[in-house]
């Protein structure tokens, strides 16, 4: 793929204004574009057309926007009965992971893996990429994946996708942006369409920084006492310690320094979600990072692949209050429960996990055998044991939820 070259070109073009003329400029007497298309370049407008095209699935009827609904912070489930887990283009197909927001995704670096040493033990730290398991290095590479996924848009090949675009309503826009020969080579055409999607997803609507917290940083809003307490719990390394992974520059008033993720991966031992059809097979486990295609090529010497099993990418917390479901498997449908799980996973595991015949909690039940040892149990707030006091209280949980609600961008619901 030409993803790296396309990304470099796009970043330069978007920054310098060298992309095609803005689509919001209409000729005298011509119909004005919809309000949400004003100011878009032709490249960005093409990306929007692809994003909203429900003819690109097999069978037709499913678009990117079907699962990534703009009003829900570009996430959703396409009418699935399982919160956060999307139905595919075929009515009998349902995914196994929560649909992630694609807002603020352009801030994620390309996927990489570095060697680390933790208490004398060699480990590997993954960072960046797209999807819960990082299987796409960047957004250009990511764009084609749902189109070909049999559980999502279900196209059998790139050639089929490109032929649909060629026969579609905006084929003239494709040739205007990329030239008349664009459809000659399907792989090149697919990469060009992916770059258009990237250009659209790099627009301000995907990273508006319009939340109350952003206004607070700018000095235009004040946090309530409860929200301020929640922010303290969030940043306190001896309480929530959320900022350890959902990072922000504490001294910065620039919203772009607060993406609320370090783009790394972690194993949290989230309870198994019985609502996911694939989980009906007790021998089936979603192992995340260690099953990323091509992961072995990134793996440092002397680091075992199995050590990455159970890890999933740390998501941004921006717009988390409108997510509707939480964690990679959408097990939690309440933001308060998702936060309480952090606080009490290890002090009261029976609250979250099913019981074994012994009466004990089947802790980390979405991992098998020795892979349960991969779960993060040392970092605050997970460094507690049954009977110990949680790192933060019920009142702190309420305050933290109140703070997280300040991260919702305007217009999201």
Describe every region a protein language model picked out:
Residues 2-5, 24-413:
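Periplasmic c-type cytochrome electron-transfer domains
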Residues 8-20:
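Bacterial N-terminal signal peptides
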């Amino acid at each position: 793929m030409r993803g790296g070259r396309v990304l470099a070109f796009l970043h330069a073009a978007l920054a310098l204004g060298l992309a095609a003329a803005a689509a919001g400029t209409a000729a005298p007497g011509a119909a004005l574009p919809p309000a949400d298309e004003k100011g878009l370049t032709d490249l960005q407008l093409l990306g929007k057309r692809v994003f909203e095209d429900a003819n690109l699935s097999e069978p037709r009827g499913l678009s990117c926007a079907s699962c990534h609904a703009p009003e829900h912070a570009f996430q959703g489930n396409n009418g699935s009965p399982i919160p956060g887990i999307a139905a595919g283009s075929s009515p009998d197909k349902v995914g196994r992971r929560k649909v992630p927001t694609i807002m603020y995704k352009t801030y994620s670096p390309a996927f990489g893996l570095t060697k680390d040493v933790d208490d004398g033990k060699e480990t590997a730290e993954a960072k960046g990429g797209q999807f819960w398991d990082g299987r796409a290095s960047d957004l250009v590479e990511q764009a084609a994946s749902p189109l070909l996924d049999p559980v999502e848009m279900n196209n059998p090949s790139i050639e089929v996708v490109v032929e649909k675009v060629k026969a579609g309503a905006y084929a003239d826009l494709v040739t205007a942006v990329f030239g008349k020969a664009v459809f000659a080579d399907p792989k090149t055409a697919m990469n060009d369409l992916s770059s258009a999607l990237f250009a659209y997803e790099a627009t301000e609507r995907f990273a508006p920084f319009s939340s109350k917290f952003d206004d607070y940083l700018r000095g235009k809003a004040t946090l309530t006492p409860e929200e301020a307490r929640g922010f303290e719990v969030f940043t306190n390394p001896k309480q929530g310690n959320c900022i350890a992974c959902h990072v922000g520059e504490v001294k910065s008033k620039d919203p772009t320094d607060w993406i609320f993720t370090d783009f790394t991966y972690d194993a949290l031992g989230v309870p198994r979600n019985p609502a996911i059809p694939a989980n009906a097979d007790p021998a089936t486990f979603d192992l995340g990072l260690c099953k990323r295609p091509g992961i072995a090529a990134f793996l440092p010497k002397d680091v075992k692949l199995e050590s990455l099993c159970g890890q999933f990418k740390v998501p941004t917390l921006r717009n988390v209050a409108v997510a509707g479901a939480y964690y990679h498997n959408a097990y939690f449908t309440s933001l308060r429960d998702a936060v309480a799980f952090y606080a009490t996973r290890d002090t009261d595991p029976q609250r979250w996990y099913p019981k074994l015949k012994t009466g004990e909690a089947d802790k980390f039940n979405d991992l098998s055998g020795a892979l349960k040892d991969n779960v993060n149990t040392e970092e605050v707030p997970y460094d507690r044991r049954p009977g110990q006091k949680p790192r933060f209280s019920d009142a702190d949980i309420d305050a933290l939820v109140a703070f997280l609600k300040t991260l919702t961008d305007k217009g999201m619901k």
